[in-house]
């Protein structure tokens, strides 16, 4: 079979991702475009004659970029297409928005690269009574047009057949440009490198006349002739860019008049009716908060019901199983305990997180594919405008509920450097999936029936602190107004199950692999430090270990937030959590259960792997029945109650160490708000600078320590009023000083704002191949 590389390109919300998932299934690889942190997805699939590598290009409305302050999407798409890596392009077109989508189609066809138009979302078009003559559209465009409903898999085989058959587009003159434009485009094309096809050189000439700033990178000496061409055109037409766009739109209008009835089509009545409620100025925000609460409720309840299978199952295999092997093969006791506690305990920490994290990713994917996430940005627009940000900036913040890294990277879709930087500074406060793993454990141990409510309050607190951070920046070092907010609202539709599963699987796999490697390594590292004293001797009691001795010295720093000296394990969790937040659970699990593992005698004769696995399945089945019982459906928060049988395990030890729910909640506040994990720090440094990364870390530490101290000291004020009053006043005075210093620093910061993406804007300024 011949190998073929295909670029998949289309407007946002055209169903491109769904088609990508339909074609490639789970055979996907996710990376970054060279030099930038924009995600690059590749997948594999086969047709009758070809083994295809499919490259998913960023969603974009056109290939023209007129400002360096815009997003990188157009730049990356343009560079990849001109690089020559793609043998064929598949342009995904939304049939229900044909006229707008055809602008990008015309730009692609003008390049002369073999192209297939995938006419997607025909089911939505039919509901809106839009009729399209596919054969007539194919004739007018000069390339194959394949009708699709990607959510149902309709038309996939026809698309594969078109891939095998299509080698070149028909020689059709699509757009009739004014003669002066063609003359100057030809003049610029003649000055370019002759090894580039003439059609592409003329296209680049038109792009330069239109004001595209990145086409000049390919023009070579022709870029020096641009001013001459524009000067000649000035005598013949007012605005060359306007004439170019007008010619394309006239072509699109002529095509649509012949092939469709879009002028008489009806908009979706269902979408319009639902939007009257969802986008209501009074109901929109409460509905958004309810949707977020529902997500946490389902993640904790249903995910929690599935947890025994992963928890007890991993204990049976990776802890008791390792102990059985160690005793059977006569390993030294210290080695058996080390392997069971370090390696086995690390795996046992990761796997029980899978159900709840997986449920959250599934819910987020559903919201994204259904069309609700775009509405959430509009709902939050008024609030974001108060911060001097457009509502569009809330979209990457919502992504932060899954992971803060793509949230930080998503800020590059914003236009102004100030808006990008403010969004980056706010992103780490959005509670990610790794933090949910921590919250779920503490909710079960301390908050009983109010567990889901406690978790929801932490998520809301994260949003509030992100907003307050934005307000602080607006009134101190980043004053300014928001740019206008224009965003397309896709119609509502039921997400495709296969696409949901693939998206959830990709996210969950990334989380498990990333978290697993770190947690297992940290667990082994902690087990080693927990087994020896500072003098290097093996200890019988972990309280005499090197880890305990060092941690006790540091723990008094956290006394104001409710971490007492004997709870040194919690201090270790905060430090390891800086590597990855999910490691906090692994650290606490390893340290709180260390004594139990040392003290418990393991009898190999009593170990029966099959019985323990059957017990895990039985517990899971019982949990599922309880979760979906009538009593729980009537009172869903009941399903998140803590398990009293865990009193002798890690949760029981944790309960004793913290002493109260107030101390535990204060600890969670600190975990929510303090330093982001290493991967997020790296993303912040790449998207802005190391200086802004340092600012984000210091600001997060201050907010976390201040808020956790205020909460704990207020709730425990009656126990030590004098100490609490001193702590509260110290926090207030310190923050007043910090805000005063930030206001004075404004004049020095403003100059540096435009430089925050200096390395990014220049990353693709060379040859086309540099961006792939």
From Swiss-Prot:
Which residues are involved in binding GTP? 120-123, 149-151
Q: What is its main location?
A: membrane
Q: What induces it?
A: Iron uptake is repressed by the global regulator Fur.
Keywords of the record, alphabetical order, are: Cell inner membrane, Cell membrane, GTP-binding, Ion transport, Iron, Iron transport, Membrane, Nucleotide-binding, Transmembrane, Transmembrane helix, Transport
Q: Which residues bind GTP 1?
A: 10-17
**Where, by residue number, does GTP 2 bind?**
35-39
Single Gene Ontology MF annotation? ferrous iron transmembrane transporter activity
- What family is this? Belongs to the TRAFAC class TrmE-Era-EngA-EngB-Septin-like GTPase superfamily. FeoB GTPase (TC 9.A.8) family.
Protein's name in the database: Fe(2+) transporter FeoB
Q: Which organism is it from?
A: Salmonella paratyphi A (strain ATCC 9150 / SARB42)
Q: What is the lineage of its organism?
A: Bacteria, Pseudomonadati, Pseudomonadota, Gammaproteobacteria, Enterobacterales
Q: Which gene encodes it?
A: feoB
